[in-house]
Regions:
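Structural preference for beta-strand elements that scaffold enzyme active sites
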Residues: 2-4, 28-30, 54-61, 94-97, ...
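Active-site beta-loop-alpha junctions enriched in small/polar residues
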Residues: 6-10, 32-34, 62-65, 101-103, ...
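Acidic/histidine-rich catalytic cores of soluble enzymes
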Residues: 28-29, 119-217
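Core segments of cupin and vicinal oxygen chelate
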Residues: 35, 295-302
Length: 302
């Protein structure tokens, strides 16, 4: 199973990010358009640069505000998608993420969205590309992976699949076991991110307080078990938006992220050994037993 990390998860310029990701042991990365807008190279050169580091581009993202738009906005959305297809072909990857629309003029309706994605799937197929649909926790009409899956199911196109994100599912307190009913081959990509259990706007918490798996309060093991039970065999990828990480040392953050993914997969394997997981041999767990030292601190008249 391939490991991946979003470039936005770590600090540094683009070259520093690539070096850190490769050194940590990841197989690939999620690339954002901002990466090469700020980098002095065209998309084709960026793709070559990534592959020269022994990495692959696992997904290009994000493409926003696509589905459910009335004309002429709908026609413009398809034009935008075609331009993005040009871009990802130059990069040398085949998968693009579309997140659920937040556009104020987007119209709800499962069948309407499914029709949009079926047409987009036809366009993607002509280019040998795939499109994954992800439900944002704050999406205007679609904010639940169950609705996103129903749209993908009704779109009924081999080049259209579902993208899951642990934060978007668990932060909304959606039962992760609902994922088990989804065919694994229709899940194109999975993002992993933990977060603290704090009462905060979902968007703001996502953009500033995501954590590595195991560093927050979300049921990462339950989510991952559900995903793997579907037979999913695509990349496992970190997508961490965190202000401290963006200000930290790239290599340190990348290494911590890689270790967190391995630890999560090991936890899942121990919890449900029957799941088909490729996990490196890990040392036996050491359990703390009792206390050997306690230190107290006081100040002033305390």
């Amino acid at each position: 199973m391939k490991t991946s990390i979003a470039t936005v998860s770590i600090s540094g310029n683009f070259a520093e990010k690539l070096e850190a990701i490769a050194a940590a042991g990841f197989h690939g990365l999620e690339i954002f358009e901002q990466d090469f807008i700020a980098h002095d190279a065209n998309p084709r050169e960026v793709g070559e640069m990534i592959r020269a580091m022994g990495l692959e581009i696992t997904i290009f993202q994000p493409f926003r505000d696509f589905e459910g738009l009335p004309d002429p906005l709908r026609a413009k959305a398809f034009d935008r998608a075609e331009h993005k297809f040009d871009l990802i072909q130059e990069l040398g990857t085949d998968l693009m993420l579309i997140c659920s629309s937040c556009h104020p003029e987007a119209i709800g309706g499962i069948d309407r969205a499914a029709a949009d994605f079926h047409e987009l799937g036809e366009r993607a197929k002509k280019r040998g590309l795939r499109v994954g649909y992800e439900a944002l926790a704050w999406g205007r009409h679609v904010n639940d992976h169950r609705d996103a899956w129903e749209i993908v199911r009704r779109a009924d196109h081999e080049n259209i699949g579902l993208i899951l994100d642990s934060y978007h599912t668990l932060a909304r307190k959606i039962d992760p076991d609902t994922i088990r009913r989804i065919p694994g081959d229709k899940i194109f990509f999975v993002h992993f991110a933990d977060a603290p259990a704090i009462d905060m706007d979902l968007l703001y918490r996502s953009r500033h307080f995501r954590n590595m798996p195991g560093e927050g309060d979300l049921d990462m093991i339950g989510f991952t078990r559900a995903v793997m039970a579907t037979g999913y065999s695509g990349p496992i990828s970190l997508e961490i938006f965190n202000d401290q990480f963006r200000g930290g040392q790239p290599k340190t953050i990348a290494k911590d992220g890689y270790r967190s993914l391995l630890a999560l997969m090991d936890d899942v394997h121990r919890a449900e050994p029957a799941l088909a997981l490729t996990v490196p041999d890990m040392p036996a767990r050491i359990q703390a037993k009792g206390l050997s030292f306690i230190e107290f601190a006081s100040k002033g008249q305390d």
